[in-house]
Amino acid sequence: MSITFGELVGNFILVTGSVIVLLLLIKKFAWGAIESILQTRSQQISRDIDQAEQSRLSAQQLEAKSQANLDASRSQASKIISDAKEIGQLQGDKLVAEATDEAKRLKEKALTDIEQSKSDAISAVKTEMSDLTVLLAEKIMGANLDKTAQSQLIDSYLDDLGEA
């Protein structure tokens, strides 16, 4: 089957005419709807791009705010740690000072107690010695001494004893 040139040109004209008629019909009846769909889709894409840009900007702002909050929290934590160290040091120094004061107070009290015990012991020894001196004097003199003589004798003996 061979197609002649005339048939080929006829087919060409028929197909071209059909395409032109089809395009005219599409333009008359469907082109508005197609153009409306394409316009709507274009607007939707434009809105989606704008929303994506706004979301990106919002995310950047949120990230910056979160970073600022994190930095502030780190700074506050560092300050709290620093303050706690300082308070600990002050309390330690205070405890050491209190312990030192308590040790000094106890030492002074011990020294006072020692002095008091020494004084009590010396007083007891003096009393004992005065009694022994009176007994000795009575035996030596063979008689009881009156109070004044006894007192003078005791004082003189104690003075001699204190110097020794």
UniProtKB/Swiss-Prot annotation:
It is a single-pass membrane protein. F(1)F(0) ATP synthase produces ATP from ADP in the presence of a proton or sodium gradient. F-type ATPases consist of two structural domains, F(1) containing the extramembraneous catalytic core and F(0) containing the membrane proton channel, linked together by a central stalk and a peripheral stalk. During catalysis, ATP synthesis in the catalytic domain of F(1) is coupled via a rotary mechanism of the central stalk subunits to proton translocation. It comes from the Bacteria. InterPro entries: ATP_synth_B-like_membr_sf, ATP_synth_b/b'su_bac/chlpt, ATP_synth_F0_bsu_bac, ATP_synthase_B_chain. The lineage of its organism: Bacteria, Bacillati, Bacillota, Bacilli, Lactobacillales. This is ATP synthase subunit b. Its main location: membrane. The chain crosses the membrane at residues 6-26. F-type ATPases have 2 components, F(1) - the catalytic core - and F(0) - the membrane proton channel. F(1) has five subunits: alpha(3), beta(3), gamma(1), delta(1), epsilon(1). F(0) has three main subunits: a(1), b(2) and c(10-14). The alpha and beta chains form an alternating ring which encloses part of the gamma chain. F(1) is attached to F(0) by a central stalk formed by the gamma and epsilon chains, while a peripheral stalk is formed by the delta and b chains. One of its GO terms (molecular function) is proton-transporting ATPase activity, rotational mechanism. The gene is atpF. NCBIfam families: ATP_synt_b. It comes from Streptococcus pyogenes serotype M4 (strain MGAS10750). GO terms for cellular component: plasma membrane; proton-transporting ATP synthase complex.
